[in-house]
Structures are given as structure tokens and as C-alpha cells.
């Protein structure tokens, strides 16, 4: 095999492997049958930020900030401050679950519910030792639950149910708290950039009718 043929073969191999990794990443973020039957839809396609935006700007974003990227089927936050990542769509009553893991021990982020277009209010804290605290809004019953979180490098599953003014929060399949008094009726979902690297995937949501 001459050098030109060898280089072409290597290029084809690299392309095939890249496509394989992308396909595997997309499959890893697919909904299970149980999730589909329950009415969940995926908020993340495992490839890009379709359905999301930064600081209330265009969706999908034309330019990515330095601290957010999609890689290996994951949303990766390298740290830094703004911009936060927000949904392109507003939600009223919903159930959402997602998985996150800390890359380092000293992590900090947050999960926004019914927030403004530039997400920043109504945050369930995701800062080490303060996970679960409610910031930027007033509800009664929320509390810090660091004891329910796993150590850095392991995946945590958070689940949040928002119906009317009530918010119910689970960590790793354990009920963390139930709170009432959420004032905003509708808003955006988001993830906070707060100076620490984290990774997210398996973002699922189902919208609920008021009667649910």
C-alpha cells in the first residue's frame, strides 16, 4: 500500500469512528420505553444545543460561549460565569428529570424553574454542600440536602415536579422536599454557569395539564 492510499484509509477510519461515537452518544440519550409511555420527551439530542439558548438569545445559538459545549453526548460546562443555558420554550406545569455529575470536588451550578428568558430566578441550588436550597425566589419547604448527592465523578439524577405553586424535588430516587408558594405561573428552564466544571445528560420533560 502506497503512502497516499494509507493516508486515505486512515482518514476513512477516523470518519467512521467519529460517526460511531456520535451514534453511540445519541443512543445513550434516547428515551426508554417507560419514559415514552409516561409522556416524557428529550430536551437534549446528544449532538448540539437545539432547543436551548444563552441569555435569551437565538435558538439554536449561532455562536457558543467558551464555557459551554456538547461533547461525547454530554452537555459540558467548563466553569466561568454567564451566560447561563436556558430552554427556548417556556413551561407551566411539568415534570423534569436529568442527570449531572461534578468533574471536580468544589462544584457549583443550579437548576432554574419558571425563570425569565435570561434565566436567573427560581433556582434549585447545585453547589457543593448546599444542594437543594432554593435561591432567587420564595417558597416554603425547600432545604439543603447534600447528604443525598453522590461523590464527584458519579452521576446524580434530579427530578422536579412543578404543579401550580407546588414544587416537589427528588435526588437519586429519594424525596428531598416538597415546597409551596412558587409565585411565577410560567417560565423557562435553565442550567447555571457558576465557575465550576460539570456535565449533564438525559434531560427529559413532560408537560402536565393543570388537573395532573
Language-model segments: which ranges?
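Carbohydrate-interacting regions of secretory-pathway proteins
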Residues: 27-212
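N-terminal secretory signal peptides that target proteins for export/translocation
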Residues: 1-9
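Bacterial N-terminal signal peptides
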Residues: 12-24
Amino acid at each position: 500500500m502506497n503512502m497516499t492510499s494509507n493516508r486515505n484509509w486512515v482518514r476513512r477510519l477516523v470518519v467512521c469512528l467519529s460517526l460511531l461515537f456520535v451514534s453511540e452518544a445519541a443512543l445513550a440519550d434516547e428515551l426508554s420505553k417507560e419514559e415514552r409511555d409516561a409522556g416524557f420527551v428529550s430536551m437534549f439530542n446528544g449532538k448540539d444545543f437545539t432547543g436551548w439558548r444563552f441569555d435569551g438569545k437565538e435558538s439554536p445559538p449561532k455562536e457558543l460561549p467558551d464555557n459551554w459545549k456538547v461533547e461525547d453526548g454530554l452537555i459540558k460546562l467548563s466553569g466561568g460565569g454567564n451566560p447561563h443555558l436556558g430552554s427556548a420554550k417556556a413551561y407551566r406545569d411539568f415534570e423534569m428529570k436529568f442527570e449531572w455529575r461534578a468533574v471536580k470536588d468544589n462544584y457549583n451550578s443550579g437548576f432554574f424553574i419558571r425563570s425569565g428568558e435570561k434565566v436567573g430566578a427560581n433556582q434549585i441550588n447545585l453547589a457543593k454542600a448546599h444542594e437543594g436550597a432554593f435561591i432567587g425566589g420564595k417558597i416554603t419547604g425547600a432545604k439543603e440536602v447534600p447528604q443525598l448527592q453522590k461523590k464527584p465523578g458519579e452521576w446524580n439524577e434530579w427530578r422536579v415536579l412543578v404543579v401550580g405553586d407546588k414544587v416537589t424535588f427528588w435526588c437519586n430516587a429519594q424525596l428531598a422536599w416538597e415546597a409551596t408558594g412558587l409565585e411565577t405561573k410560567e417560565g423557562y428552564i435553565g442550567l447555571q454557569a457558576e465557575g465550576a466544571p460539570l456535565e449533564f445528560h438525559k434531560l427529559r420533560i413532560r408537560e402536565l395539564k393543570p388537573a395532573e
